[in-house]
A protein has these predicted regions:
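Adenosyl-5′-phosphate
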Residues: 1-4, 22, 71, 116, ...
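Long, Lys/Arg- and hydrophobic-enriched amphipathic alpha-helices
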Residues: 349-354, 586
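Short secondary-structure boundary/capping segments
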Residues: 306-309, 345-347, 389-397, 610
Length: 610
């Protein structure tokens, strides 16, 4: 993985802006600590920060190829999982290769197929290709949205980057937010409306989108979306195909020129990945795999059982590690440091985020990076295969709202009267806009129609937030995390799978459990879904209280929006928040942590409300 950025403005000579271009590039150095590169051609500049994973010598970027009197230049962030097949296809068409990097395959695929190359790629990526002849720029983001690509268009020019901080470093993009941005932060956060970058004028290519910038105009195009199709496979075939698609995705993602490791939570998803990889290594005599898990200091003492998280993870982690014969290490996080890392997690996202769910992951990845550059993780199975409670509780399922954020009451309680009066309406409209796009079949039952809507909501909202979290918090330490459940072939198959098959045995992710039950311990295969762990230690809550009270004493733009009495009520009566205000576990400590992140974000980024 890497960091990419670029600036196209043919009214300027970019060679006169080298210092500014270098500053933009330097903001991405955590994404690519190994190498950096810069391409400048009068009105065009492309920047690259490289994390070396495959073909160190021949994968340097920006990479250029001359073909039929035209030079094409690429900056690429990601991993391709069908590199070998595409390379052979291109060789058969007369292309020659100087190395075995996927970057070269992507570039020559574009030369061969143009914009249709996107449909050839199986992987996680974002890239830009500059054509020196017609001075056009092609942008593309992977089908599922695992890798980010932001942009800012202005009169006569375009900026793009892996992260917003690089756009801000250009000085063209201002750290400004308007009412829409405030609604995003206060009523939708840590989620974002698809394509909306919160800062005024900043946008992001959606999953499965590409764009062409030519003659000072950007034209976006959807090259991929899930389609509603009839599921014709019977139960046995569905089980077999689910297993094949996921196993193939995992094995494709084991390719690396550097050592890789695995996240292990003791849940179904990471256990499938770990066991499949362990079996693959054993078959190919590649040795034991290395696994990591995260825990909080004294969490066994303070753990609080809930419907979302009925049991702690450590017993199941130990069981799975023994079953797969892994070299395992548990990373135990200090609760005060988890609070301290809230600030770095804002720097990683460029926005307030998942608070301690972010900061703990960031610390976890820092530790892993000391020994590894690549890891595999089990994200997104719940979104695809109905793992969350809101898929199974029909009372929640048919509520006409975002199921992970059903009420805005807690969010409203921290704001002064009259601030963002239309916040609830804003959220409602985003919800309606999304479900209206969900592809359906005329033959769908009411339940299947709603399940398609729920899949679509989770895919474009909840899942994107989790993928953003995983990308930013891991790449902040230069750790590449791969997500096999995000293979687009598996996504397509899951979208059209009837609910009675997906929920095989009337269980969340039942079809996945059934598909892999012969290789997993029964206790893990049929264990109730448990989310990413959070700290229950009162030290964390007390740290948040102390910092929030200090914030409330400041004179700041943020405090002109916040209601100190409402916040004090949360501090004094945290147990009144019985339902999460976002996701499954975010309650009183997390709303306080969100205020801490908001305060830091406004100050650190010099955010101006316009």
């Amino acid at each position: 993985m890497c960091g990419i950025a670029g600036w196209i403005d043919h009214s300027q000579d970019m060679s006169e802006r080298i210092d500014l271009l270098n500053r933009m590039s330097e903001t991405l150095d955590r994404r690519g600590p190994d190498e950096n590169g810069l391409y400048v051609n009068r009105g065009a500049a492309l920047m690259h920060r490289r994390l070396v994973v495959i073909d160190r010598e021949n994968g340097k970027q920006p990479m250029s190829v001359r073909h039929k009197d035209t030079t094409y230049v690429i900056v690429y962030n990601g991993e391709l999982y069908n590199t070998a097949e595409l390379r052979e296809e291109l060789k058969a068409s007369g292309f020659h290769f100087r190395g075995h990097s996927d970057t070269e395959v992507v570039l020559k695929s574009y030369i061969k197929y143009g914009a249709d190359c996107c449909k050839k790629l199986n992987g996680i990526f974002a890239f830009a290709i500059y054509n020196t002849s017609d001075k056009s720029l092609f942008l593309c983001r992977d089908r599922i949205g695992v890798k980010p690509l932001f942009y800012y268009e202005y009169n006569g020019g375009l900026l793009f980057a892996s992260e917003i901080k690089a756009l801000l470093a250009s000085k063209i993009v201002k750290p400004q937010i308007d009412e829409q941005g405030l609604n995003e932060i206060f009523f939708l956060g840590p989620a974002r409306t698809p394509s909306f970058g919160v800062f005024k004028g900043v946008f992001e290519l959606n999953p499965g989108e590409c764009a062409m910038y030519r003659h000072s105009k950007l034209r976006r195009k959807k090259y991929y979306t899930v389609e509603a199709k009839e599921h014709t496979d019977n139960e046995v075939t569905t089980i077999e195909k689910t297993r094949y698609l996921l196993t193939d995705a995992i094995q494709r993602q084991l390719v690396s020129d550097v050592p890789l490791c695995f996240f292990l939570s003791g849940g179904l998803d990471s256990s499938i990945i770990v066991k499949t990889a362990s079996m693959y290594n054993k078959e190919h005599k590649l040795g034991k795999i290395n696994t990591y898990s995260v825990e909080y200091r004294d969490n066994e003492k303070y753990f609080q059982k809930s419907n979302f998280q009925p049991t702690p993870d450590y017993e199941f982690i130990s069981m799975m590690s023994k079953n797969a014969d892994t070299k395992h290490r548990e990373i135990v996080l200090d609760n005060t440091l988890v609070c301290d890392a809230l600030y770095e997690s804002v720097q990683a996202r460029d926005l307030p985020g998942y608070v301690d769910v972010d900061s703990s992951l960031l610390l976890f990845c820092k530790e892993i990076k000391q020994n590894y550059t690549v890891a595999l993780s089990g994200e997104c199975a719940d979104e695809l295969f109905g793992g969350y409670p809101w898929y199974h509780n029909h009372e929640i399922l048919f509520e006409d709202c975002f199921p992970w954020s059903k009420s805005q009451d807690i969010r409203r309680s921290i704001l002064r009267d009259g601030v963002l009066k239309n916040g609830e309406e804003y959220v409602r409209q985003r919800y309606l806009d999304t479900i209206s796009l969900a592809p359906k079949l005329k033959s769908d039952t009411d339940l299947d129609r709603r399940m398609r809507e729920m899949f679509y909501l989770n895919f474009y909202w909840f899942m994107q937030c989790l993928l953003e979290r995983k990308d930013r918090c891991s790449m902040f330490s230069g750790l590449e995390v791969r997500v096999p459940f995000c293979d687009y072939r598996l996504v397509e198959y899951a979208y059209n799978m009837p609910w009675e098959l997906k929920a095989w045995g009337n269980r969340e992710k039942g079809i996945v459990r059934k598909a892999f039950e012969d290789i997993l311990p029964e206790e893990i295969c049929w264990r109730k879904k448990s989310p990413y762990p959070k700290t229950h230690n009162p030290i964390y809550f007390n740290e948040c209280v102390k910092r929030v009270r200090k914030i409330l004493k400041k004179r700041s733009i943020l405090n002109e929006l916040l209601d100190s009495k409402g916040i004090e009520d949360i501090i004094e009566n945290p147990d009144k928040i019985t339902n999460p205000w976002y996701g499954q576990l975010m309650k009183a400590p997390q709303i306080l942590a969100y205020i801490i992140e908001l305060d830091y974000w406004f100050d650190k980024y010099n955010v101006e409300i316009v």
